[in-house]
């Protein structure tokens, strides 16, 4: 557990996975991407938002805690290779929801696809969706 957290607070936070998740991928032009067309190495932007239990929201905002709990990324379809995985550094909060926007470099050399967008919280998969390459 991160320093500054009592065991009780840490346990409460671990059990309070975000709910009502929305995960969207946007292409470099800012359009919603349902599939990925890779012509060159390109930056896509992954938007992840969800609802956080009000009792843990101040702890949830701690970067040290999120760094150990939240994983957002893109996996290859066999699940073996995680192309990209990260804890975002910037969160926006409003009305009990968080939003983070994460730049994702997708390289044309990795164009096999399909990939899976995924969000996990304390090792538990909360969300995944296939995204195809063309």
Describe these PLM feature segments.
Residues 1-44:
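Short, compositionally biased P/S/T/A/G/V-rich stretches that sit at domain boundaries
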């Amino acid at each position: 557990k991160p320093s500054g957290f009592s065991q009780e607070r840490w346990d409460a936070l671990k059990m309070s996975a975000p709910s009502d998740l929305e995960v969207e991928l946007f292409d470099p032009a800012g359009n919603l991407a349902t599939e990925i067309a890779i012509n060159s190495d390109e930056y896509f932007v992954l938007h992840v938002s969800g609802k956080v239990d009000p009792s843990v929201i101040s702890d949830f905002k701690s970067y040290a805690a999120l760094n150990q709990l939240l994983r957002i990324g893109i996996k290859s379809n066999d699940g073996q290779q995680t192309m990209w995985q990260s804890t975002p550094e910037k969160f926006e909060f409003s009305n009990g929801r968080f939003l983070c926007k994460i730049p994702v470099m997708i390289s044309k050399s990795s164009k096999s696809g399909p990939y899976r967008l995924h969000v996990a919280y304390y090792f538990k998969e909360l969300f995944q969706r296939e995204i195809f390459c063309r």
